[in-house]
A protein has these predicted regions:
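Hydrophobic alpha-helical segments
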Residues: 1-246
Length: 246
């Protein structure tokens, strides 16, 4: 299996670590953070910095809401949504580990620990391998993601809706890691980078432009007339003029 948790050592180990030596103990309380986005890291800032952080309550509330949608306490899978809570949290742990932000690793490891892992069938192992490899690559070297890699996710059983959710949660945890790293920096502490990981790609300014760019989906598009009621409601909320302009 790609993911392994060593209960005998009361700790966590994930296949993206370079070795099992020196892995950190699992803190079960890390899953119980009242603020599952900042994980209590803001409480250790001096009062002036803490007040500046909390002036951005709109952004923080939106981030917490995203967390709750992507990582609920319970989740039922269906024919069109096969990405289980185990899949989501194990992928989040992969992204947290390649980010090297220890509180984030502890949190997702603690949430993952009580869950039952998938069966050990060949198909399940292949699926977990593809999910883990894609999560790691998108989090560290996103420019290497190709259309065939997206097709491979579909080949191992992820629906288009699964793939969208999957890439969203990878992006969210990467964003969360950066916020926590900034908080650590404000406290004068560098994020603890685990050994054996490649450095994430830097962002190039030339990648941003105000010019009108052409865009095409790499996933099958959903026609408005065949969309579910929930999808139509979301479309009306975020783009009220989309139907009339299409």
């Amino acid at each position: 299996m790609e993911q392994q948790r060593k209960a005998a050592h009361s700790g966590w180990y994930h296949e993206t670590q370079s070795s099992q030596q020196g892995h950190l103990p699992l803190d079960p309380h890390a899953a119980l953070a009242q603020d599952r986005f900042l994980l209590g890291q803001d409480a250790q800032l001096d009062p002036t910095l803490r007040s500046l952080i909390h002036e951005r309550q709109g952004l923080l509330n939106a981030s917490r809401a995203c967390y709750d949608v992507l990582f609920p306490d319970s989740l039922k899978v269906s024919r069109t949504e096969t990405l289980s809570l185990y899949d989501r949290l194990s992928s989040a742990l992969t992204v947290a580990q390649v980010s090297g932000v220890q509180p984030l690793c502890s949190h997702y490891a603690a949430r993952l620990a009580p869950l039952s892992s998938p069966d050990a069938s060949r198909e399940s192992n292949i699926r977990q391998t593809h999910i883990t490899q894609f999560a790691r690559l998108l989090a560290t070297q996103p420019t290497l993601i190709t259309p065939p890699m997206l097709s491979q996710l579909n080949d191992v059983g992820l629906s288009t809706q699964d793939i969208v959710t999957f890439t969203q949660l990878i992006g969210f945890v990467s964003y969360q890691a950066r916020v926590l790293a900034i908080l650590n920096g404000l406290r004068g502490r560098a994020a603890a980078v685990l050994p054996g990981f490649p450095s994430p790609e830097g962002c190039e300014q030339k990648g941003y432009s105000l010019a009108m760019l052409q865009w095409s989906s790499r996933l099958p598009e959903v026609a408005p007339e065949s969309a579910s009621q929930h999808q139509q409601d979301v479309l009306d909320l975020i783009a009220p003029d989309a139907r009339s302009s299409s």
